[in-house]
Amino acid sequence: MAVLEILSIPDPRLKVKAEKVTDVSTIQTLIDDMLETLYATGNGIGLASTQVGRKEAVVVIDISDERNDPLILVNPEVVSGENKALGQEGCLSVPEYYADVERYTSVVVSALDRDGNPITIESDEFLAIVMQHEIDHLSGNLFIDYLSPLKQKMAMKKVKKYVKAQAK
């Protein structure tokens, strides 16, 4: 297993649309590496393959306090959603920036698990928000894309400052 580099805005690879996985046996190492990368962040709760420069439609999520209950979603899709509300979001690809985003508070998501079995997840909790955020990444969308141009500029400025400070 390996810790992968997490891309930051404005990297154009974050805008790439993921491709459906046709054979889950080909992504087992990717899943393991994505989980290791997620856990290495210390505070991340979700990671999409496009955030590590990969094109396969894979999402890993772990919202457990102990960080030992991963949810693997292959080819995930939001089938339905209800009741929109504003909630604060952040992103590993937009470090140190948080903003309110409107999302469904209740969703149904269909996907494959890491073994290729079809799964359906219904959630009206925090997981619903996290799944939407990560699935957006697979479409080449970031949470800041929902913000005004001014707030997008502010996010870019903050991330550039953060990346510059990390490079020192």
Swiss-Prot record:
Its cofactor is Fe(2+). Its EC number is 3.5.1.88. The keyword Cytoplasm does not apply. GO terms for biological process: co-translational protein modification; translation. Binds 1 Fe(2+) ion. It comes from the Bacteria. One of its GO terms (molecular function) is metal ion binding. It is an enzyme of class 3 (hydrolase). It holds the Pfam family Pep_deformylase. InterPro entries: Peptide_deformylase, Peptide_deformylase_sf. The active site is at E134. Fe cation binds at C91, H133, H137. Keywords: Hydrolase, Iron, Metal-binding, Protein biosynthesis. Removes the formyl group from the N-terminal Met of newly synthesized proteins. Requires at least a dipeptide for an efficient rate of reaction. N-terminal L-methionine is a prerequisite for activity but the enzyme has broad specificity at other positions. Belongs to the polypeptide deformylase family. NCBIfam families: pept_deformyl (TIGR00079), PRK00150.1-3 (NF001159). This is Peptide deformylase 2. It comes from Vibrio parahaemolyticus serotype O3:K6 (strain RIMD 2210633). The gene is def2.
